[in-house]
Amino acid sequence: MDGAGESRLGGDGGGDGSVGVQIRQTRMLPDFLQSVNLKYVKLGYHYLISNLLTLCLFPLAVVISVEASQMNPDDLKQLWIHLQYNLVSIIICSAILVFGLTVYVMTRPRPVYLVDFSCYLPPDHLKAPYARFMEHSRLTGDFDDSALEFQRKILERSGLGEDTYVPEAMHYVPPRISMAAAREEAEQVMFGALDNLFANTNVKPKDIGILVVNCSLFNPTPSLSAMIVNKYKLRGNIRSYNLGGMGCSAGVIAVDLAKDMLLVHRNTYAVVVSTENITQNWYFGNKKSMLIPNCLFRVGGSAVLLSNKSRDKRRSKYRLVHVVRTHRGADDKAFRCVYQEQDDTGRTGVSLSKDLMAIAGETLKTNITTLGPLVLPISEQILFFMTLVVKKLFNGKVKPYIPDFKLAFEHFCIHAGGRAVIDELEKNLQLSPVHVEASRMTLHRFGNTSSSSIWYELAYIEAKGRMRRGNRVWQIAFGSGFKCNSAIWEALRHVKPSNNSPWEDCIDKYPVTLSY
C-alpha cells in the first residue's frame, strides 16, 4: 500500500527547544468478523457462473467416457441397430453436440501463461543504511529537528533493513534532483529487469506483441513504454500501454490488461513492467503525513513475460487463474487517503490520511468477499454463505464465518507496503508466520518497491524451493484510488528460481528475526 500505516507520529518541540515526538496509534484494519456485504458475495458467484458451461461439460465428458469404456461388442451392435432406425434423432443430437462444442470453443477462457519474471537488483553502492539515510537527510538542511526525529522513529518501526536502496541522485548532498536523473533511474530499473528476463527466456524483443508499463509518479514524454520500445527496437505494430498514477496496486492492473489483450490477440507474447520512480518524488518538507513515503519507498522494479501460446505451457512457471479488482474511488475519503499535493510551503509530496488503514481494510474485505466463491472449496463456501444468510435473518446477531483461505492457497504475496498491513492481514486472515514470511522479508531486504513488491515476494518463495506443481499463489496489492487487486496463479511445475534472482546472494540469511 502507498505507505502502509505505521504508527502516526507527530508533535513539535517544546518551549525549551527540545524535540517532542508523540506516537498516536491509527485505527488498524477492521476485523473481518464484522459485517460482509452480500452484494459482493453475489458478484463472486456471478464470476463463478460465467464459467458454468466449462464446469458442467467436463464432468459430463468424464461420465460419457466411463460408460463408453464399459461397452462390449454386443452393446455396440445394439447401438448400431438403434442408430439405423433413429436417423432423425441422430441428426438432431449431432447438431446439438456440434453446437455445444462450438459454443464451448468460442467461450472457454484461453489460458494465459507466465513464462518467467525478473526483478531488478540495484548495485551495492545504492544501499541506504539507517545512519546514512539520517545523515543525508540532516545535511540537506530541508528538515527541522522534529521532522528528522519523526523519520528516525518511522525507520525504526518500519520493518525495513539496512540493505534497501535509494536512487543515485539521493546519494549526493545536496540531492541532484533533475529530469535527467529521474530518467536515468527509470532506465536502470526497467532495462536491468528486462535484460535479465530476455536472457533467461531466450525470447527476442521483436517477438513481443504487447507491452504494458506501470509507474505511478513519473510519467515523462516520451513515455516509459516508448523508452523501452526505443531501447529494444520493438516492432512497429506493438500494442504498448503506459499506466500512471495508479499506485502500488497497478502491477495487478497491468497484468489484467495484458491478459485481456492476450485473449484477443492470438499467438503472441506480452511483457508487463512494474516500477516506481523516487528521484523526483522525494519530499523535502516537514509535514508529517508526507514524510512517511521517504522512509518506506525504495528502488525496485520487475518485468513479467506472459504468453498465450499453447506450446509455451511446458516451459512456463504459472498459469493465470483469476484477477479480481476492487475500486473505492467513488468514496471521497478513499479517493483522498493517498493524495499527491503541495504542503503550505509549496513543496510536493504524497500525503497519507489517518484513515488509510481503515479504508484499506474495507477495500480488502470487499475484494476477498468477491474472490471467495471463485477459489474456496465447496465446504468453505457453504459455511460462509449459510452464516451470511443467518446473519441477515437475525439482524447481525450472528458473526459471519470467515473462510480459511489457507485451504485455497499455499502461498501468499501480500504487498510489502509496511509492517502494519502485513501484521493485520496475518491476524485477520488467520495466517501463520510462514505464510507472510515472503512479505516480511521482502520489506526488510528491499523496502516498499511499490507495484513490483509482489514479484520480489514470489521470487523469495521460489528461492526457498517451496513452489510445487499445482500450488496456488495469491498476490494481493493495495494502491491509491483507493484500490485492492488480487491475482491468482497456479504453478505448472516444481518451480526453481531463475538465474540472477534478486535473492541469489542472500537467501541463505533469511528469514531473519525482526525486532521493532
From Swiss-Prot:
Native source species: Arabidopsis thaliana (Mouse-ear cress)
InterPro entries for the chain: 3-ktacl-CoA_syn (IPR012392), ACP_syn_III_C (IPR013747), FAE1_typ3_polyketide_synth (IPR013601), Thiolase-like (IPR016039)
Metabolic or biological pathway: Lipid metabolism; fatty acid biosynthesis
Catalytic reaction equation(s): a very-long-chain acyl-CoA + malonyl-CoA + H(+) = a very-long-chain 3-oxoacyl-CoA + CO2 + CoA
Keywords recorded for this protein, A-Z: Acyltransferase, Membrane, Transferase, Transmembrane, Transmembrane helix
Gene designation per UniProt: KCS4
Record EC number: 2.3.1.199
Coiled-coil spans in chain: none
GO cellular component terms given for this protein: membrane
Residues forming the catalytic site: 248, 327, 411, 415, 444, 448
Every FAE domain range: 104-393
Record-given protein name: 3-ketoacyl-CoA synthase 4
Superkingdom of origin organism: Eukaryota
Parts of the chain that traverse the membrane: 48-68, 87-107
